[in-house]
UniProtKB/Swiss-Prot annotation:
GO terms of biological process kind: prolyl-tRNA aminoacylation
Catalysed reactions, semicolon-separated: tRNA(Pro) + L-proline + ATP = L-prolyl-tRNA(Pro) + AMP + diphosphate
Primary enzyme class: ligase
Gene name tied to this protein: proS
Organism: Xylella fastidiosa (strain M12)
Task performed by this protein: Catalyzes the attachment of proline to tRNA(Pro) in a two-step reaction: proline is first activated by ATP to form Pro-AMP and then transferred to the acceptor end of tRNA(Pro). As ProRS can inadvertently accommodate and process non-cognate amino acids such as alanine and cysteine, to avoid such errors it has two additional distinct editing activities against alanine. One activity is designated as 'pretransfer' editing and involves the tRNA(Pro)-independent hydrolysis of activated Ala-AMP.
Protein name: Proline--tRNA ligase
Amino acid sequence: MRLSEFHLHTTKEIPADAELVSHRLMLRAGMIRKLASGLYTWSPLGLRVLRKVEAIVRDEMNRAGAVEMLLPTIQPRELWEESERWEKFGSQLLKIKDRKQAEYCYSPTAEEAVTDYVRQELTSYKQLPVNLYQIQTKFRDEIRPRFGVMRAREFVMKDAYSFHLSDADLVREYENMRATYTRIFTRLGLEFRSVQADSGAIGGDASQEFHVIADSGEDVLAFSTGSDYAANIEAAIAATPGPRLTAKETLQKVSTPTQKRCEDVTALLDIPLQRMVKSIAVMTDSGFFLALLRGDHTLNDIKLSRLPGLANFRLANEVEIARHLGSEPGFLGPVCPGMSIRIIADCEVAVMADFVVGANEVGFHLVGVNWGRDLPEPEVVADIRNVIEGDRAVDGGKICIARGIEVGHVFQLGRKYAEAMKATVLDEYGKAVTMTMGCYGIGVSRIVAAAIEQNHDVAGIIWPAPIAPWQVAVCVINPKKDPVIIAAAELLLAELQSADVDTVLDDRGLRPGVMFADMELIGIPHRIVVSERGLAAGTYEYRARRTAMVENLDKTTLLTRIKA
């Protein structure tokens, strides 16, 4: 490949709305160009990277026994009504009509289409299990597309769906896919974590997310120093706290005239934030509750919503708070003599003693509060908080917190879609049995951006070698000055290509500084300079992109270094 024959257009200009490093660098490197909000054209350079990601994903899926197929991106309303997702999916589902006014959607996911295919094609248990996958463009009508291809409306995804006769067989394939995803992200050269996760809108019985570790990640991850335990912050748990502490203080009411925030109250009282208990007023289908958390902890909405009767909880408003407690936010507390207030205490709060709470009186808090003496034992004790850095993990290690970009997700869907769409096969006794399903997705185009978020410096992208557009760039200084120079470069190019090293020849005749800056920006792992001075000395200048190490090497040593 010669750059003089390749469309490469880099730029120094960055749009004001390009917030993430990956968005800025993909634009500067000429990998993508914006067509409309959330819609991007992939240039020849960007497509080379995208195709390399696809190739690794496809290779490992095939190795795992999955079979590739291709489903329509435009799908009929009737199919989505069978699964009851035509309305439930919400405004992200792009709906369209054809000339006959028949309604369709642009597929954001393909559970319905693949289930329809399978229920027509599979009739016997002897045809199971099967795992079908595709690599296809999807569309979600994001209300505010941002971050370039990280959260675009149109994106490339690998989605796979497995069908089974039994739950045990589904679990086996689920574990097969988890192992496959680990191989995929390892081959991509990325630092990643596999974490326990909530199944979200797709639903299902068990799920695991795969995250690329990056400071810019939107997801918060918790993992242990003691084992491979890792979870999304929504699902992460800490070790069960020890026994309740012994009460030593008496109850007192103290003035906190302007202090509403936990941090301000504890600063005024000169006590640790961990001694504060904050009260969060919530409304549920069964009435008013106070959810109690330690002062340095935050509420985990998902954990709270999973408690009996709290699936539809919401935060109480000021009118509701005044009606139930006669107070206002900032001074709420669970000590309510003469009133029957229902309390949900986080596990950590349930073992506290001598803690501080709001007095349900503006300008006052209570100190030295203890269970059983100053307020009744909580109606519910449960884990309703987010874990924090330094928590004791369930395996005895310490919890560490990092940010991640979700690039893969595996689900055990169960029979949710198969039951809704009547997808059955005959078992060995001739009885119709509903199939059980697994779902396995990878954000192919998102991986490209995530890789950049994890691998870059001030000069540009530093691609992991497996997905770089080229492994080696041979840069020619003054190619038109002396035919010997270009001949030597072409010979080196041929030798590298014959050794299956993906190589590009930069024969554009640009100034060295401009040429080198381009190669650093687009992230080529190895740069070789062919120059008149180097040839006279029998050497080539070699530079490793990741380490910035520069050496003058003879050809034999150079080729050995590149192939290593």
